[in-house]
Amino acid sequence: MSLITTTAKKFILTFCLLCLATEVWAVRAKIRFLFPVSMESVTDGFENTKINTSEFVLSFLMPVSRNTQLDFGYSYFNARIEDADTASEAYSGVFRAHMLEIGAGYTGIELSRTISMLIEASTRFPVSGQAEVNGTPSSSEAESISGMGYFLGSGIAYGNIDLLLFYQQRDLTFDELTVLRDGVSKDVALHSKEYGISIGYTF
């Protein structure tokens, strides 16, 4: 029996890649917080859901030219979902995903001496996650995740701070996570589109 789980191996691999990136390139790190103001979501297996999400991103920026940089980082996504009060079989769920981010940013358009326009785009791949669903008449848990996410943002950069308007999309499936509806087992998956404001700090 292996002493290291598959999830632990994925975490170790991601950490090693991030450490390697900091050694090979003269990189800078960025912390980004996302604040959704509008969301469209569909959660397979749930009925007329209420959803609350939060997300935190840590990126390493690797310059490839004066105005272009690659983005290699980590995103932590958390969601809490509940069936509407009118649902005949009420469930609630918690979803957590650890995602690897690969993208690029461009700051070649100067608006003033100190302010530049910033355009960012990235793709996110889940490397691990946990989810649980509780309710009547059944409950389930899962730790295996698959899917993909996309991020696109445009805004301004001033010194070490940037402010973006963003759009992002996620499609996440937790294997073996199910709910029971009218005696039939249904898979649970999260599909969401968000518009919002992003604040980043580079150090």
List each language-model region with its residue ranges.
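Short glycine/proline- and aromatic-enriched beta-strand/turn motifs that initiate or cap beta-hairpins
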Residues: 23-82, 200-202
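Outer-envelope beta-barrel architecture signal
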Residues: 25-31, 54, 66-70, 98-100, ...
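Membrane-embedded beta-strand positions of outer-membrane beta-barrel proteins
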Residues: 29-35, 58, 70-74, 102-104, ...
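Transmembrane beta-strands of outer-membrane beta-barrel pores
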Residues: 33-41, 74-80, 106-108, 121-129, ...
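Flexible, solvent-exposed loop segments that connect beta-strands
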Residues: 37-50, 75-98, 127-146, 173-190
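Transmembrane beta-barrel architecture of outer-membrane proteins
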Residues: 51-57, 97-101, 145-151, 192-196
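Outer-membrane beta-barrel proteins
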Residues: 57-66, 104-112, 158-160, 201-203
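Predominantly the C-terminal beta-signal and adjacent terminal strand-loop region
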Residues: 83, 150-203
